[in-house]
C-alpha cells in the first residue's frame, strides 16, 4: 500500500511511475544508479507566463520549430489539434513518461484527438505540470486556441530541455506521423522565409534559458542537438517543387493553345464547305445533299448509320455465302 504522501492513479500505479508498453510498471525513484537515469525525473519546471514577449514566435516559425524537433510535416497551427506532437515532445523531455505506442499519430477524428490529449494530461500529472489542457477548445481546431497553447508549450520546452540527443522517428518505432486532414491552406501557400535548424529561433529549443525569478530548479544547458530529421522537407525543396509544377502548367497551356488553333482551322474549312453546299443546294445534286447530311449529322446519327451499314454488309456477306453453297 502507498505511504501517506503517495497517491495512486486510477490504474493503481503511482503518478510518477513509468508505464512500459507491455504494462510493466517501474516505480519512480529520485535517486537511482546511472543506468536507470532515463527513468529518473525531477519535477518539471512549471511555466506560468502567457504574455506576448520578444521571444514569442510567429505562427510560421512555431510550425517550423515543431517540424524540426520531432520530424513532422505540419503546415498549419491548427494541425496541432491532434495532440500527437505534444505527446512526442513530452517523451523527448522526460523519456518514458508517456507510451508513444498508444499515441495515434495518424489521428483524423475528434475522439482520436481527445485520446491523445488524455495521454498528454496523464503525463503532465505524472511530471507535476500544473498546466490544465483546454482539450475541448484545442480539438475543435481553432487557430487562436492552438496558437496560445503551442506558445506556452514552447516556453515550457525551453525551461525543461537539457540538450540530450533524441531521434523522434526511432522513438515512434516506425509509426507514420501524418498531419491531420485540413481543407484549408495548401502546400503552395507555405511561407517563403526559410527556417533552418541552426537558426536562432530553432536553436533556442536546444538550450535551457536563464532561470526566471521564482523558479526553484533548472536543467543544465547542453551543446548537443536533437537528431536531424531527414524526412522533413525544407521550404527550399517545396519551392523547387512548386516551380516544376508551374512549368508543367505553362507547357500544358501552350499545348492547349495549339489544339484550339488547330480546331479553329478545321472548323473554318467545314464552314466554307457548308456555305458552298448551301449556295448550290437548290440544284438537287445528290452529292451536295450527302455532304449536307454529313455536316449536320450528330454523333448518335453517325453511330446509327455506321451500325446500319455494318448490318447491310453482314447481310450481303451471308447472301454471297449462300450463293456459293448453291453452286
UniProtKB/Swiss-Prot annotation:
Keywords carried by this UniProt record: Cell cycle, Cell division, Cytoplasm, Cytoskeleton, Microtubule, Mitosis
PROSITE patterns: CH (PS50021), EB1_C (PS51230)
Stretch list, region Disordered: 1-20, 170-238, 295-327
Domain EB1 C-terminal: 234-304
One biological process term in Gene Ontology: regulation of microtubule polymerization or depolymerization
UniProt feature, compositional bias: Polar residues: 1-17
Compartments in which it is found: Cytoplasm; Cytoplasm, Cytoskeleton
SUPFAM superfamilies assigned to the protein according to its UniProt record, in alphabetical order: Calponin-homology domain, CH-domain, EB1 dimerisation domain-like
Main localization category: cytoplasm
GO molecular function, one term: microtubule plus-end binding
Domain Calponin-homology (CH): 56-158
Signal peptide: none
Gene Ontology, cellular component aspect: cytoplasmic microtubule; microtubule organizing center; microtubule plus-end; spindle midzone
Domain notes: The N-terminal domain may form a hydrophobic cleft involved in microtubule binding and the C-terminal may be involved in the formation of mutually exclusive complexes with APC and DCTN1.
Function: May be involved in microtubule polymerization, and spindle function by stabilizing microtubules and anchoring them at centrosomes.
Family classification: Belongs to the MAPRE family.
Protein name as it appears in the record: Microtubule-associated protein RP/EB family member 2
Protein's organism: Xenopus laevis (African clawed frog)
Amino acid at each position: 500500500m502507498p505511504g501517506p504522501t503517495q497517491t495512486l492513479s486510477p490504474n493503481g500505479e503511482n503518478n510518477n511511475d513509468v508505464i512500459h508498453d507491455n504494462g510493466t510498471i517501474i516505480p519512480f525513484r529520485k535517486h537511482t544508479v546511472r543506468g536507470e537515469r532515463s527513468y529518473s525525473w525531477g519535477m518539471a519546471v512549471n511555466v506560468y507566463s502567457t504574455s506576448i514577449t520578444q521571444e514569442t514566435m510567429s505562427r510560421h516559425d512555431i510550425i517550423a520549430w515543431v517540424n524540426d524537433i520531432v520530424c513532422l510535416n505540419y503546415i498549419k497551427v491548427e494541425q496541432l489539434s491532434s495532440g500527437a506532437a505534444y505527446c512526442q515532445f513530452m517523451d523527448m523531455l522526460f523519456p518514458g513518461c508517456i507510451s508513444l505506442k498508444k499515441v495515434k499519430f495518424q489521428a483524423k477524428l475528434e475522439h482520436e484527438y481527445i485520446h491523445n490529449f488524455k495521454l498528454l494530461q496523464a503525463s503532465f500529472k505524472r511530471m507535476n505540470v500544473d498546466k490544465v489542457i483546454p482539450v475541448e477548445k484545442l480539438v475543435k481546431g481553432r487557430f487562436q486556441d492552438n496558437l496560445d497553447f503551442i506558445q506556452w508549450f514552447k516556453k515550457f520546452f525551453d525551461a525543461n530541455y537539457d540538450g540530450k540527443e533524441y531521434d523522434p522517428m526511432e522513438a515512434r518505432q516506425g509509426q507514420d506521423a501524418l498531419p491531420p486532414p485540413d481543407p484549408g491552406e495548401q502546400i503552395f501557400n507555405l511561407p517563403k522565409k526559410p527556417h533552418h535548424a541552426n537558426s536562432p529561433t530553432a536553436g533556442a529549443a536546444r538550450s535551457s534559458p536563464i532561470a526566471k525569478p521564482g523558479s526553484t530548479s533548472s536543467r543544465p544547458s547542453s551543446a548537443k542537438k536533437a537528431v536531424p530529421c531527414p524526412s522533413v522537407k525544407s521550404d527550399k525543396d517545396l519551392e523547387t517543387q512548386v516551380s516544376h509544377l508551374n512549368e508543367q502548367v505553362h507547357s500544358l497551356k501552350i499545348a492547349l493553345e495549339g489544339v484550339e488553333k488547330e480546331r479553329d482551322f478545321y472548323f473554318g474549312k467545314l464552314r466554307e464547305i457548308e456555305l458552298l453546299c448551301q449556295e448550290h443546294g437548290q440544284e438537287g445534286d445528290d452529292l451536295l445533299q450527302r455532304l449536307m447530311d454529313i455536316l449536320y449529322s450528330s454523333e448518335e446519327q453517325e453511330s446509327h448509320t455506321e451500325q446500319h451499314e455494318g448490318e447491310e454488309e453482314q447481310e450481303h456477306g451471308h447472301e454471297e455465302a449462300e450463293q456459293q453453297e448453291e453452286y
